[in-house]
A protein has these predicted regions:
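Short, Lys/Arg-enriched N-terminal segments with co-localized hydrophobic residues
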Residues: 1-5
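Aromatic- and Gly/Pro-rich donor/ligand-binding loops
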Residues: 12-19, 23-176
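Alpha-helix N-cap/helix-start capping motif
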Residues: 26, 188-189
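A short beta-strand/loop micro-motif in the catalytic core of glycosyltransferases
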Residues: 181-188
Length: 189
C-alpha cells in the first residue's frame, strides 16, 4: 500500500445539535483515517458570534425590517441571544459524542489555522456552502488558505437549497476560490 498519509483538516458546519451533521463529520473523519491520513476536524468556539461595534445596530435594524416585511418567515432579530440560551440544553445529548469520537480542534476563527499545519483541507459534508449556515461563506471555500500549497477538496458539499443565497460579490469570490480546488464532489446535480 502506498504511503499517502497527509495531515488533513476537515472544515464543516458547527458541531453541536445536528445529529446528521455530526454523523457525517464522524464518518468522513473515520474514512480519511482509515485511508491513513492524520485528521483534525476544525470547530469554531463561538458558533454564532454577535454583530460587533458600529455594525451591530445596522444588523439588528436590518433583521427587524425584514421581520416586519416577511412576518414569521423573516430572520429572528436577536437570534444569537436565543442560541446562547438554548445551546447548553440542545447539545447536552450530543457533546459527549463530539468529545469522544470527533475530538475537534476548537478555534476562535479560521485565521487561527497556520500555513504549515495541514497538507490538505476537506470541506464537507453537509450544507457547508449555504451562507445562511456558514459565515463568512468564503471560508467554506477555504479563503483562509489563499496562497498556501495545500490540497483542497470538497466532499459531498451542498448548497442546501435551490434558491440563491449569495450576494453577487460573494458568488464571484467563491467561484474564484473553487477554481483552486483539487477535487469537488457535491450533492446537487
Amino acid at each position: 500500500k502506498e504511503d499517502i498519509q497527509m495531515k488533513t483538516a476537515i472544515v464543516t458546519l458547527p458541531l453541536h445539535t445536528n445529529y446528521g451533521g455530526l454523523l457525517q463529520a464522524y464518518a468522513l473523519k473515520t474514512a480519511l483515517e482509515d485511508m491513513g491520513h492524520e485528521v483534525t476536524v476544525l470547530d469554531l468556539k463561538d458558533k454564532m458570534p454577535s454583530p460587533k461595534g458600529l455594525k451591530a445596530p445596522f444588523v439588528y435594524a436590518n433583521r427587524a425590517m425584514k421581520r416586519l416585511l416577511k412576518g414569521s418567515a423573516g430572520p429572528e432579530v436577536f437570534r444569537e441571544k436565543r442560541y446562547r440560551r438554548e445551546l447548553p440544553i440542545l447539545s447536552a445529548e450530543t457533546s459527549g459524542f463530539v468529545d469522544s469520537y470527533i475530538r475537534p480542534r476548537m478555534i476562535d476563527s479560521y485565521e487561527d489555522v497556520k500555513k504549515d499545519e495541514y497538507e490538505a483541507f476537506v470541506v464537507g459534508s453537509d450544507q457547508v456552502w449555504r451562507p445562511r449556515y456558514f459565515s463568512p461563506i468564503e471560508n467554506a471555500f477555504l479563503a483562509f488558505t489563499k496562497g498556501w500549497d495545500v490540497k483542497r477538496v470538497a466532499y459531498a458539499a451542498s448548497f442546501g437549497t435551490d434558491q440563491l443565497e449569495y450576494e453577487y460579490e460573494q458568488l464571484a469570490e467563491c467561484a474564484r476560490l473553487l477554481d483552486g480546488f483539487d477535487g469537488v464532489s457535491v450533492r446537487e446535480d
